[in-house]
Regions:
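N-terminal nucleotide-binding beta1-loop-alpha1 segment
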Residues: 1-18
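Short, high-confidence coil segments that cap the C-terminus of an alpha-helix
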Residues: 47, 94, 119-121
Length: 135
């Protein structure tokens, strides 16, 4: 079995760089909408579980409601959430773990399928403008 982990900040902290243009409620709504878009893609991958790691109960409720496995984040920040998912994957004997930030735009099941079937111990997907990575 394999898993895709989606680490999500607390809705109170999410999309902080947009604080000057969006209210806290708008940032929370944007975060949840983007999470749902990514869940639409990840939940279509056969043989892959989707885990949502977050300290935010609302995020975990959305994840569970959509069919993903909610994982209460034990300790922020992002690197610790990823480490938590790695440890969980190891304890469950998973064959593979992918980490995908849930605010990655325009994710499709087809693109994820190509990425997760790429051979190699580590796969990075560069952003279209090559200023970062998305997977």
């Amino acid at each position: 079995m394999r898993a895709i982990a989606l680490p999500v900040k607390s809705l109170d902290e999410a999309k902080g760089r947009l604080a000057r243009v969006l209210s806290p409620l708008e940032r929370a709504a944007l975060t949840l909408a983007m999470l749902e878009d990514v869940l639409d893609a990840t939940l279509l991958l056969p043989g892959w579980e989707t885990w949502v790691v977050s300290p935010d109960e609302s995020v975990l409720e959305v994840a569970a409601g959509r069919g993903a496995t909610p994982m209460p984040e034990e300790q922020p920040p992002l690197a610790q959430a990823i480490r938590q998912a790695e440890e969980e994957a190891l304890s469950r004997g998973m064959d593979a773990l992918a980490v995908l930030l849930p605010d990655t735009p325009l994710v499709t099941a087809a693109a994820l399928t190509r990425a997760v079937h790429t051979l190699g111990p580590v796969v990075l997907a560069p952003a279209a403008d090559e200023t970062g990575t998305n997977l």
